[in-house]
Amino acid sequence: MESTHKKKILIFIDWYRPAYLAGGPIQSVFNMVNALEKDYFFYICTSNSDIGSGNELVGITPNKWLKSSSNSEVIYLSAENRTKKTFLSILKIQEFESIYFNSLFSFKFSLLPLFLAKNLNTGSKLILAPRGMLGSGSLKLKKTKK
């Protein structure tokens, strides 16, 4: 992992580049990382597959921090490493200014790490981005599951 003097933000997101099938959320987080490159360094924790696919992303080494851009590193977690133990170790690697959760209804990449971060009392600002998931139209879909 890179050491930097910029403020550090940890992002949890189900899918990230080169995954693309989830569309907008991937692109908006990518755009945020690029727009804030002068002031922040991002650590992105994501899965090593694309939405609806059990296949690993091609050319990606899972479970290892990889340089993504001048201001970001990404860890692509395999299914067997999306565990409480792994998330705790990621949350403890260093102090983060903020921890950003890019979903509301994702157990592995929002609820579990949010619960762990809250209980660790890291001092980091916790940002939960529901991304329209609380809209009346969205709540009508798969109501029981949500």
Regions found by a protein language model. Give the residues of each.
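Glycine-rich nucleotide phosphate-binding loop and flanking beta-alpha elements
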Residues: 51, 106-107, 134
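Glycine-rich His-Gly loop
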Residues: 14-15, 103, 132
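Short glycine-/acidic-enriched loop or helix-start segments at secondary-structure transitions
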Residues: 21, 54-55, 86, 109-112, ...
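Short N-terminal targeting/anchoring amphipathic segment
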Residues: 88-109, 113, 123-129
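N-terminal subdomain of nucleotide-sugar transferases
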Residues: 1-58, 64-66, 94, 122
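Glycine-rich, highly charged phosphate/nucleotide-binding loops
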Residues: 58-59, 74-88
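Active-site proximal beta-strand in glycosyltransferases
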Residues: 8-9, 98, 117-137
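A conserved, positively charged/aromatic
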Residues: 134-146
